[in-house]
């Protein structure tokens, strides 16, 4: 894995970092010098980055598949165990899966398929990222702590307090819990009934549906004897969350296929029903009794959040396909949807679609040509995104006045006219193949415009409300996708398959409808995201201020383009070697990990002097004027060797002889992920987003470092 490295401390650096002439500054400087000299004499420096992150951990992934059946009944059963130990102590991930599929031919006219799976995952996340004023972040703590202060556990089992930050990260890691346990069950069925079959037509009825049950239990525990907890009024913090989701879907459709002379027609009409049920409870206890983890054993007990969500959606769809001898293929369709989330839950919204494709090589003028495929295509479609739950209504909040419980209106007012966000997309493309498709090109250009984008609209204070949801914003999305694949070289004992992909996407705020604002991050001092009509989505702005309310543009989180290069080599029919490169050009991150390192004096080049003016780099970051928001906005371009694999498949006759016909296939190999990363980005990984916000992403705040992974692979078929 990539480590950032830390700047070494010296007496000269301490005298500068803790400079000052007041008595308190002098006392602090002398104290730090004493600590440094003692550590130096005992050679007891601690590289905290190495201590927490630089570890080799074992992971395993085991799968077992069993399949079989008869001409009427076929089955597939699979199970898997995935066990990953995290880089950081007491972190990791385990997943257990069971899956069963059954295909039953009830009669010649009735077929039934049933699929079911169960997934149980257990995640110990640890404490990285933003610390939310709890001290619970390894990244924050080690950025502030010099390497000459030893925070490790003492022989008597205690942990020293951290004088440089609000928490000792080693005690935090050893004693605290941040766990998520998920149980999920997914089942589905598909029933097909052939109503009639003729020589040139048939009609069938299709009924399919499914259910998805998810239970997610989260637990965060910060013991009362942690440093930060001892500094607050109610030490000892326990936070328990429980989410239960039960979703079902049911779809019924009639399909009629017939020939209209030389044109095959396929007609569909159907309806769909979706039901969503979500219950969430998040409780918190503060001021825990010693050694307790029960909310009821806390001095302050709070229902931090609770909601019950019930959503219903229904739709009707019609579709007509026409296929002229596989030469010209066209589709027309429309879907009518309604949702209980919309302002008018009974209103049906229409979403049409159409597509046309032509296989020109199926016509006589291109038959037996070196161009083996030439397929221009065009498609248009409309769709919608859901309205946020509760946007229609003005919710009530609980109040306590003189010991009497009551309810009052929230400051956010509902919008009974709220509409779903809609998208209209036009796609133009062509698929080209030459030399019997030994070389293929796929090219697509698309324009996607979204309307009725939901944004908060601030209201006049005299209204008594602060904001409401609005449908005023519009986005314009334009992009291109290219794929070039082929077999550059093929002989009896060697085959090379290759695929090169390129994609580029630009999103512009074509209409905002509300006043310009910034969102995400920690404000204009460090870099935040601009929401302004005519600007690209993801524009990063910050100090210095140009005009009142207008700040310097430092970059954009959208990449200029992405590329991938995938190759597979088959050697002597038994060896397979493959690798995948990913390249992202452009796209900026707000790197606040460096902010924390600079503030703690620990960034790798902190005491260097790049421009020779006598001021350390950590106190004077480019670009000029120094120490503006631009110093945290970095180009996050990268080239990554994403995957590499080398596998050997034993010849069938050798396998059967070696395993006495008990094993039909034996395959072994080695593989790796994230083996090479080429980037100028100074953080752990340019692929980071601490908050996962779609509008304001690409913020780097003490993340969990990404790891290089190596696997030994064994596969046996019995």
Spell out what each predicted region is.
Residues 1-89, 127-130, 174-175, 179, ...:
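Residues embedded in well-ordered regular secondary structure
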Residues 170-176, 300-317, 400-440, 468-491, ...:
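Outer-membrane beta-barrel signature, preferentially recognizing the C-terminal barrel domain
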Residues 369-371, 602, 613-718:
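Membrane-interface anchoring segments and C-terminal beta-barrel signals
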Residues 277-301, 364-422, 438-475, 513-545:
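Solvent-exposed loop/turn elements at secondary-structure boundaries
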Residues 32-39, 404-410, 449-472, 506-557, ...:
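Surface-exposed, extracytoplasmic segments of Gram-negative outer-membrane nutrient-acquisition systems
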Residues 35-67, 71, 223, 232-329, ...:
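Outer-membrane beta-barrel transmembrane domain signature of Gram-negative proteins
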Residues 70-152, 177-216, 237-277, 282, ...:
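Transmembrane beta-barrel strand/turn architecture of Gram-negative outer membrane proteins
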Residues 1-30, 119-160, 282, 374-399, ...:
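A surface-exposed, glycine/aromatic-enriched loop/edge motif typical of exported proteins
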């Amino acid at each position: 894995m990539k480590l950032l490295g830390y700047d070494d401390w010296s007496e000269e650096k301490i005298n500068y970092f803790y400079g000052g002439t007041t008595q308190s500054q002098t006392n602090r400087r002398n104290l730090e010098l004493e600590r440094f000299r003692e550590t130096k004499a005992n050679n007891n420096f601690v590289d905290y980055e190495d201590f927490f992150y630089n570890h080799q951990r074992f992971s395993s992934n085991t799968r077992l598949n069993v399949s079989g059946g008869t001409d009427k009944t076929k089955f597939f059963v699979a199970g898997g165990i995935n066990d990953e130990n995290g880089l950081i102590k007491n972190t990791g991930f385990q997943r257990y899966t069971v899956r069963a599929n059954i295909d039953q031919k009830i009669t010649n006219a009735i077929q039934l398929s049933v699929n079911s799976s169960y997934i149980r995952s257990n995640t110990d996340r640890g404490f990285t990222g933003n610390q939310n004023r709890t001290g619970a972040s390894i990244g924050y703590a080690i950025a502030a702590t010099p390497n000459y202060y030893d925070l490790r556990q003492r022989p008597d089992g205690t942990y020293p307090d951290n004088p440089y930050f609000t928490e000792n990260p080693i005690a935090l890691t050893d004693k605290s819990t941040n766990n998520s346990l998920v149980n999920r069950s997914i089942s589905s069925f598909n029933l097909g009934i052939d109503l009639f079959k003729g020589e040139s037509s048939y009609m069938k009825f299709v009924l399919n549906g499914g259910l998805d049950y998810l239970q997610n239990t989260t637990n965060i525990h910060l013991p009362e004897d942690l440093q930060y907890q001892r500094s607050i009024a109610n030490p000892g913090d326990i936070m328990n969350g429980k989410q239960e989701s039960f979703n079902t879907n049911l779809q019924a459709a009639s399909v009629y296929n017939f020939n209209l002379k030389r044109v095959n027609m396929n007609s569909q009409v159907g309806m769909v029903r979706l039901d969503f049920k979500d219950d969430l409870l998040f409780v918190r206890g503060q001021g825990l009794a010693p050694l307790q983890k029960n909310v009821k054993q806390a001095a302050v007990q709070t229902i931090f959040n609770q909601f019950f969500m019930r959503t219903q959606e229904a739709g009707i769809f019609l579709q007509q396909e026409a296929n002229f001898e596989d030469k010209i293929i066209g589709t027309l369709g429309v879907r009518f949807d309604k949702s209980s989330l919309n302002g008018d839950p009974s209103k049906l919204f229409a979403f049409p679609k159409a597509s046309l494709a032509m296989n020109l090589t199926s016509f006589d003028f291109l038959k037996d040509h070196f161009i083996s495929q030439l397929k221009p295509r065009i498609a248009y479609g409309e769709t919608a995104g859901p309205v946020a739950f509760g946007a229609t209504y003005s919710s009530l909040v609980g109040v306590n006045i003189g010991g009497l419980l009551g309810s009052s209106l929230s400051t956010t007012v509902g919008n009974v006219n709220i509409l779903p966000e809609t998208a209209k997309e036009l796609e133009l493309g062509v698929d080209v193949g030459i030399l019997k498709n030994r070389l293929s090109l796929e090219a697509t250009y698309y324009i996607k415009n979204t309307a009725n984008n939901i944004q908060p609209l601030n209201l006049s204070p005299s209204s008594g409300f602060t904001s409401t949801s609005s449908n005023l914003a519009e986005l314009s999305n334009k992009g291109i996708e290219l794929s070039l694949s082929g077999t550059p070289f093929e002989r009896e004992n060697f085959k090379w398959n290759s695929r090169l992909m390129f994609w580029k996407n630009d999103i512009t705020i074509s209409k905002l409808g509300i006043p310009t604002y910034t969102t995400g991050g920690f404000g204009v001092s460090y870099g935040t995201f601009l929401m302004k009509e005519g600007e690209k989505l993801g524009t990063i702005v910050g100090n210095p201020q140009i005009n009142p309310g207008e700040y310097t543009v430092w970059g954009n989180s959208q990449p200029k383009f992405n590329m991938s290069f995938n190759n597979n080599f088959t050697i002597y029919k038994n060896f397979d070697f493959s690798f995948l490169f990913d390249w992202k050009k452009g796209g900026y991150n707000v790197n606040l990990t460096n902010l924390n390192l600079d503030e703690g004096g620990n960034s790798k080049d902190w005491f260097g002097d790049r421009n020779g003016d006598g001021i350390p780099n950590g106190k004077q970051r480019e670009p000029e004027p120094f120490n503006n928001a631009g110093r945290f906005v970095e180009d996050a371009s990268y080239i990554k060797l994403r995957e590499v694999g080398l596998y050997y498949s034993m010849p069938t006759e050798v396998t059967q002889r070696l395993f006495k016909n008990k094993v039909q296939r034996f395959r072994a190999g080695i593989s790796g992920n994230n083996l090479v990363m080429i980037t100028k980005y100074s953080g752990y990984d340019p692929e980071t987003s601490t908050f996962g916000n779609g509008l304001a992403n690409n913020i780097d705040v003490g993340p969990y470092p990404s790891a290089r992974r190596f696997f030994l692979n064994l596969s046996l078929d019995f």
